[in-house]
Amino acid sequence: MAAPSCKNCLTGYMKTEKPTGTVSTIHGLETYVATPPNAPQGLIVMIPDIFGWETNNSRLLADSLSQDGDYLVYLPDFMNGTAPPPGTMELMDSLLGPSPSLATTIFYKPIWAVQFASAAIPFMARNRDAVVRPRIYDFHRAVRSDAATAHLGLGSAGYCWGGKYTIHLCQEEGMVDAGFAAHPSKMAFPEDWEKVCRPLSVAIGDVDMVIGIEDVRKIEGLMAGRKDVESEVRVYEGAKHGFAVRADPRDEGQTRSAVESQRQSLEWFGRFVAGKGGKK
């Protein structure tokens, strides 16, 4: 697995609210489970950003999808305990921010760089594609075959690091009923998009540092021209990479885009996942 695509993959705002779900071992993986207030309309498996399944941001998002859409939501530890610690965000902010003094430049920033590398390099080694892809695919197959969940429609919601895998799941018949990917990274154009065969919704900003706006327009055009699969690509004005998960609540524009992208995902799953149990 290559290095994170841009600085925005490792920066953002970390929420402090307390998630309300539970943690269980499901199909061999520790999993955060968000249970809806009513009978579930379907099941959504979240594939998180680079900071993994334990962050408040991802867990609170799982709670919202569950409560607002009546979905059972699974957020598994696909990284097997190797996600960079949330403090990596602060390290990246410090490295990229202005230096208030010469001492910061010549002493502290080199230390922060070493600390950052000590978190990022092990993640890259332990979460290369050959390791995590089978883990992700096997989990979805297990959900499909589990008598407790086989009757539910299955959606995949991937963010940043996880967006790529959601899109790849949508390239396989029978893996998921539909997918939603927010600001995906490490995508190949056009092949990753040409292979999609399940309903796919994409949310991305027009100032995303991973997929530039020219490439976004190419993706829009390619998917709009395909009549063999349901898809949508929504471009959010002024939204940065990571906005759907790590938007700073003090930034009105980023927060608005995050809320709208969540609504987008719920509308998509409402069309293609809710009540679709047993349809592979």
Residue spans for each PLM region:
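N-terminal cap/leader regions of alpha/beta-hydrolase-fold enzymes
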Residues: M1-K280
